[in-house]
């Protein structure tokens, strides 16, 4: 049985089809779930956990960021947990929402000399970990979260996105 029930919403032009995004996100996020269960002993309910992914543009994510975080600017990814969860805690039936902005992902991928798909993979994993209570508000949290991201991405065949950088 699948651990995740992923709901996809494409709210801007330029994204792939919902079917392609669903297949891509399912592969990435199921790898993240498997990793967390195996390596971090993350508990998971027997029933699938619902997760919403919104693929949007810079303008929409800027509005969401302004409304919910008082930051009137576009960003790459926003995560909204359905319920507060500490790392290692048991998720409920609804995990939360992840919102991703296409233009920012494209721009950052170019700046980082990465493919769009590789950068999108990283941002999906990053946003997903936020739903499990991981954060990067201080150096210790950032190191833990970045380590998890790097290890999950390695399972997916991707290199360390933080190589040569200071923690967030």
Swiss-Prot record:
One of its GO terms (molecular function) is metalloendopeptidase activity. Single strand-specific metallo-endoribonuclease involved in late-stage 70S ribosome quality control and in maturation of the 3' terminus of the 16S rRNA. One of its GO terms (cellular component) is cytoplasm. It is found in: Cytoplasm. Keywords: Cytoplasm, Endonuclease, Hydrolase, Metal-binding, Nuclease, Ribosome biogenesis, rRNA processing, Zinc. Zn(2+) binds at residues 126, 130, 136. Its main location: cytoplasm. Its EC number is 3.1.-.-. This is Endoribonuclease YbeY. Belongs to the endoribonuclease YbeY family. Binds 1 zinc ion. It is an enzyme of class 3 (hydrolase). The keyword Hydrolase applies. SUPFAM superfamilies: Metalloproteases ('zincins'), catalytic domain. The keyword Amino-acid biosynthesis does not apply. It comes from Agrobacterium fabrum (strain C58 / ATCC 33970).
């Amino acid at each position: 049985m699948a651990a995740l029930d992923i709901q996809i919403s494409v709210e801007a032009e330029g994204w792939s089809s919902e079917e392609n995004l669903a297949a891509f996100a399912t592969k990435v996020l199921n790898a993240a779930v498997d990793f967390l269960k195996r390596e971090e002993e993350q508990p998971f309910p027997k029933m699938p956990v619902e997760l919403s992914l919104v693929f949007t543009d810079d303008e929409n994510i800027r509005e969401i960021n302004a409304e919910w975080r008082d930051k009137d600017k576009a960003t790459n990814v926003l995560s909204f947990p359905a319920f507060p969860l500490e790392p290692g805690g048991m998720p409920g039936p609804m995990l939360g929402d992840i919102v991703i902005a296409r233009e920012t992902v494209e721009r950052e991928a170019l700046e980082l000399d990465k493919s769009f798909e590789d950068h999108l993979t990283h941002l999906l994993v990053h946003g997903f970990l936020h739903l499990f209570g991981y954060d990067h508000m201080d150096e210790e949290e950032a190191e833990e979260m970045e380590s998890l991201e790097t290890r999950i991405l390695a399972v997916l065949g991707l290199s360390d996105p933080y190589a040569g950088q200071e923690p967030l």
